[in-house]
Regions:
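Conserved Rossmann-fold NAD(P)-dependent oxidoreductase catalytic core, especially the SDR/UDP-sugar
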Residues: 88, 94-140
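N-terminal Rossmann NAD(P)H-binding glycine-rich loop of SDR-like oxidoreductase domains
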Residues: 3-23
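Mid/C-terminal beta-alpha module of Rossmann-like enzyme folds, strongest
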Residues: 212-279, 296, 301, 309-330
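Active-site Tyr-X1-5-Lys
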Residues: 137-164
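Conserved catalytic-site region of short-chain dehydrogenase/reductase
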Residues: 77, 114-124, 171-178
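NAD(P)-dependent short-chain dehydrogenase/reductase
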Residues: 158-165, 169-203
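Substrate-positioning beta->alpha
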Residues: 147, 179-180, 197-217, 223-224
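NAD(P)H-binding glycine-rich loop region in Rossmannoid oxidoreductase-like domains
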Residues: 34-41, 45-91, 99
């Protein structure tokens, strides 16, 4: 089976490509022109350069593929409002979906985000039945991902789009070249995390999400969403787990919500005045003390998503960052 993977050089995309190769599939990786694709070096794949916002280039890349796994996304959170976020997270999805229908591709696995559903407390974590509630934070990343998901589900109902949607939570793993979640690990390792907030989130191994995406080519139902979450930890627990896994001291100070919000307000103001991304914006300050917990029951039961122990995912991420020069030696 030949499968087109968008965002193939990103953290999740790099895991998806390797998972597909392990299963014996042919992979065509669609990457942006001129982009560093070092995470794909040495892999037996077909690389195609193309602009996802150009429908003809997308169709050309999709020719002769039986399935598409769309992992590319703009995860920018500053500025919190930016048309470029919508271009990647909504316009591109519309172009891909149209090409899937025109070329009669068998399966379109779209990677969304768990935040398209309302989270819950640990005792009652969010599920695929929950409404979208994160619009209150004013982040185009979350709003655009939810809007794209709604569009795809409408297209499935009205036009028979063969789409299955995967909704990952916060991912740890190798190939985190930005780094994204790896920044949290680097900060704890270097002792740069002064404290933690009262909220929490769901952490998952990127390799598990990749396995679920690959499984979705054969398993699961069209027009369904699957939350690919993992372990639900408050921030104190998460930082202690990272510190224990790496053998360093955990941050011990719990920062009050009012102080976090004040820091976020100052950060947003500084960001607007300086044009530089702040350490903490007001929307992210509000997110940081929310309980963002999710259930992975549906993805585990229907897609057979594995459940890697979180320390293993943390170590995998840290070791990759270390091997690639991101870790400051103590």
């Amino acid at each position: 089976v030949k499968i087109l993977v968008t965002g193939a050089d990103g953290m999740l995309g790099s895991h998806v490509v390797r998972e597909l190769l392990r299963r014996g599939d042919e992979v065509r990786a669609l990457v942006q022109p001129g982009r560093d694709t070092g995470t794909l070096d040495g892999l037996e794949i077909e690389r195609v350069e193309g602009d996802l916002l150009q429908p003809e280039q997308v169709k050309s890349a999709m020719e002769s593929c039986e399935a598409v796994i769309h992992t590319a996304a703009n995860t920018q959170i500053w500025p919190s409002r930016d048309r470029r976020i919508w271009a990647v997270n909504y316009d591109v999805v519309k172009i891909l979906a149209a090409a899937v229908l025109e070329l009669e591709v068998q399966t379109f696995v779209h990677v969304g985000t768990a935040t398209s559903f309302s989270p819950g407390p640990k005792e009652q974590p969010g599920t695929e039945e929950g409404p979208y509630t994160d619009g209150k934070y004013g982040l185009d990343y979350q709003d655009s991902k939810h809007a794209a998901q709604e569009m795809l589900l409408r297209m499935q109902q009205e036009q028979g789009l063969p789409v299955k949607i995967l909704n990952p939570s916060f991912m740890f793993g190798a190939y985190d070249s930005k780094p994204g979640a790896g920044q949290m690990i680097l900060s704890v390792y270097a002792g740069r995390t002064p404290g933690y907030t009262s909220g929490g989130k769901s952490y998952v191994a990127a390799r598990d999400v990749a396995a679920a995406a690959a499984n979705a080519l054969q398993r699961g139902e069209y027009g369904q969403c699957y939350i690919a979450a993992g372990e639900n930890l408050d921030y104190g627990e998460a930082f202690r787990l990272i510190a224990d896994t790496l053998g360093v001291k955990a941050p011990g100070l719990k920062i009050p919500n009012f102080l976090v919000d004040a820091m976020g307000l100052v950060g947003s103001l500084w960001g607007r005045l300086s044009g530089q991304p702040p350490f903490l914006s007001y929307p992210m300050a509000r997110v940081s003390h929310a309980d963002c917990y999710y259930s992975n029951r549906k993805a585990v039961q229907e897609l057979g998503m594995p459940q890697t122990d979180l320390p293993a995912a943390i170590l995998e991420c840290f070791n990759w960052l270390k091997e690639n020069g991101y870790v400051e030696e103590k």
